[in-house]
Amino acid sequence: MKSSKVPHGRYSRLGALASLAGRVASNVAWEGAKQFAQGNRPSRKDLVMSPANIAHVADKLADLRGAAMKVGQLLSMDAGDLIPPELSDLLARLRNHATPMPSTQLNQVLTEQWGPEWKQDFTHFRFSPIASASIGQVHEAYTDAGDKVAVKVQYPRIKDSIDSDVDNVITLLRLSGLIPKDANYQALLDEAKQQLHDEADYRKEAKAMMRFNERLNAHTDLVVPNIHSTLTTDRVLTMDFMAGEPIETLTKAEPAVRHRAVSQLFTLLFEEVFVFGEVQTDPNFANYLYQPESGRIVLLDFGATRQYTSRFTEGYRKLFLAAIEKDNPGIDAALTQIGFFAEAILPEQKASVLELVNTACEPIATDAPFNFGQADLATRLRNRGMALSMEQGYWHTPPADALFLHRKIAGLYLLAAKLDVTLNVRALLMPYLTAERVKTA
């Protein structure tokens, strides 16, 4: 895998984005001239959305890493109803890929965090990363005590570039025409900034992992790696190395194995919302590893954990119960409690939102197995969301807490569809909808 130094100066990062904007513009002009010469009359959208332009955007965000890359990730997951499918699909590849930093830059970061003699704490340290993402990359190592560990190392000075990167990238995407100019992404962008600041605090993530490790300690099907506190800093996170296969590889497994894995993850979600009051909201499939020998799922990456109030979880308890009862006034009341509706919403817009919510709740609408593989749920939700925003002009963004919870739920829907699972989700959910199971803290 090729590596490249992470640009960390404000002007070098802004310059990279500016050059990308120029490249997109020149491609539009060149392709437009070529099409006109051939007698065609292409729309500006078609010129902007050319495969070459989209590929340039995705590649540049992967090189920049950090907030620039995270905006692409968030748009591909959260704004699928607003941006074209071609851009969403290409941005989606950013969820699992970033260009790693070279060994010299890696060594500099580790020396800053652990001191110049850091290698004495290890009998082996693999400098080539086993994974790379938006905030950092992961390395395999053996400590001098003989423990095999995974070391997550944050890219240099990424934290300093978060706010400006988010603003610069969204400006770039707007000016280039890759996203609608009149779409209101401000709430999403503010949350992207806050989430990135949280994810850049590895001590905070370590504490979240330790909480989940303790909560799931007696669980036979789910496991969270132990943290090595003495080798963890604000920018380096060290944990037990846990082997496993990407959960997507279960597409080749027996139906019972796929069913069990997805059941475990839905049950965990309901436990997080209604018992823990804290949810790991990142839906990235790479956060799950499957261990075939034991059937356990390893849970990774807790940088995007969010804590929820009892009022919020009570709102979702009411929402799910109303959806099960097909009680639209109850759904309306629950969504209002959650803070879902804008004050200026029109009656026809509210009706469309209720229809959208009922579609999203189809897996719990009946007390029977739901066929995720055949339901085409993601496409129908995208189409309804697109109609609501583009045709009816309803741009209101739900509260951040709801937005990130919806990402997690949507991620499980996508995983269940990918693994072609048929599952009675209502049966898993119902025990958590009784008042005594809801978080009271």
Report each predicted region and the residues it spans:
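Catalytic-loop of the protein kinase fold
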Residues: 275-285
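Short helix-adjacent coil turns
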Residues: 326-327
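Short amphipathic alpha-helical recognition elements used for nucleic-acid or partner binding
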Residues: 315-318
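Broad phosphate/nucleotide-binding scaffolds in NTP-utilizing and phosphate-metabolizing enzymes
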Residues: 1-270, 277, 290-298, 302-310, ...
